Every structure is written in C-alpha cells, then in structure tokens.
Amino acid sequence: MKIKAPVITIDGPSGSGKGTVAGLLAKKLGWCLLDSGALYRLLAFAARNHGVDLTNEEALKLLAAHLDVQFETTAAGQGQRIILEGEDVTQAIRNEQIGSGASQVASLPAVRDALLMRQRAFQEEPGLVADGRDMGTVVFPDAPLKVFLTASAEERARRRYLQLKAKGDDVSLSSLLDEICARDERDTQRAVAPLKPAHDAIQLDSTELSIEQVLERILSEIALRDIAG
C-alpha cells in the first residue's frame, strides 16, 4: 500500500496570516502548496463572469466541477500565478468583493463536495502545506500537523487595510472591520464545514506575533513530530 505524502494544514479566519505563513512554510520545506481559498475565489470570479447567481447551488456545482484552472509557480519561485480559462487572474481574485462572494459559495454543500476531490489531489510528494478554513477538519483530517491560526478582528482588519493601501486602493478601516466580522459570522455559522479548529490542532493567536515568529513556532512543531524527515 502506497504511503501518502505528509500534509500540514493551516486553517483560520480571513486576515489571520495563514496564506502568507503557508507560502513561506511550503517554500522552506520544498513542499507543494494548496491555497484552498483561491479555489472558492476562482469560483466566485467565474460565476460573475458567466452570469451565474451566487445563490444558484446547482449551477455553481456544475461550474465548480468544470473550472479550467492551473496554479503555476512564478519564475522567481516567490509565489504562484493562478490561471483561469487561460487568463492570469492572480490579482483579479484578490479584492474584497470576490472574497465576500467566495464566502457565500463556500457555504453551499454541493459546491464544497464538488471541490473536495480537487483539493485532495494536491497531496503529492514530498509533502503538502494546505491553507484554508476546513483543511484540518474535512479535507485532510488525518494530517500529522494541524495549525489553527487566528488574530483579533481589529488586527486582521488593520493588516488588510495596510495591504490594500499599499496597492493604491481607497479603503476604509471601519468598513474592512465590518466585512471581516460579517465574514467571520458566515464562516463560523454555516451548516457545512464551519470554521473551527480541529480537535487536535495547534492553536496560535498571531495578534501580537510577527509572521517570522509564527513560522518558527510551526517549524518547531514539525521538528518535534519529525514530519519533514
């Protein structure tokens, strides 16, 4: 029987830093990376482009099953490009409107089922770092290390505000805080795969921690469990 590649899951709410930490960790280990949130953002983006209502579960299920998407590592190896239907949409899916749409479609059971096997297909040698909201509870429940990363809503809004201002976007800190709180409520209260720590997850509050400190904490856990060999 073939032994599956190891998986490290990093779950948490919007703005907790899980995507940044997961990317740095995957690069450090030389492992594959799954940004599961990008799949839901891609679906929301594709739905908008194809005129599909975000409450039409059956149409979204079909769209999810046939998403023409590729994840490509950038030439510098510093990140990934996301290609949808032949178009680079890496930046286009990273706005607040698409993020809100992603949270909506992620609450639909048929959509989550359609994307489940696609996410599990990322589990390849030498290993996988998977970030999202239900990686440790639903997608990879047998992962040897599960991390649940959080931070206060105010800190998460502040981080997002600085990111968007750096890109030249005209945003309000108070509106971002409102959006994050609304998204938290949707994600934690949905009937299917609600956002919550796995029972065996390591919980880290990054409110007062730098990205480097969070990464070091996770690397220490990896060493203790001898996961990366």
Curated annotation (Swiss-Prot):
It is found in: Cytoplasm. PANTHER family: CYTIDYLATE KINASE (PTHR21299:SF2), CYTIDYLATE KINASE/PANTOATE-BETA-ALANINE LIGASE (PTHR21299). One of its GO terms (cellular component) is cytosol. GO terms for biological process: nucleobase-containing small molecule interconversion; pyrimidine nucleotide metabolic process. It comes from the Bacteria. HAMAP family: Cytidyl_kinase_type1 (MF_00238). Its EC number is 2.7.4.25. Keywords: ATP-binding, Cytoplasm, Kinase, Nucleotide-binding, Transferase. Belongs to the cytidylate kinase family. Type 1 subfamily. The gene is cmk. CDD domains: CMPK (cd02020). Pfam families: Cytidylate_kin (PF02224). ATP binds at G12, P13, S14, G15, S16, G17, K18, G19, T20. This is Cytidylate kinase. One of its GO terms (molecular function) is CMP kinase activity. InterPro entries: Cytidylate_kin, Cytidylate_kinase_dom, P-loop_NTPase. It catalyses: CMP + ATP = CDP + ADP; dCMP + ATP = dCDP + ADP. Its main location: cytoplasm. It is an enzyme of class 2 (transferase). It comes from Pseudomonas syringae pv. tomato (strain ATCC BAA-871 / DC3000). The keyword Membrane does not apply.
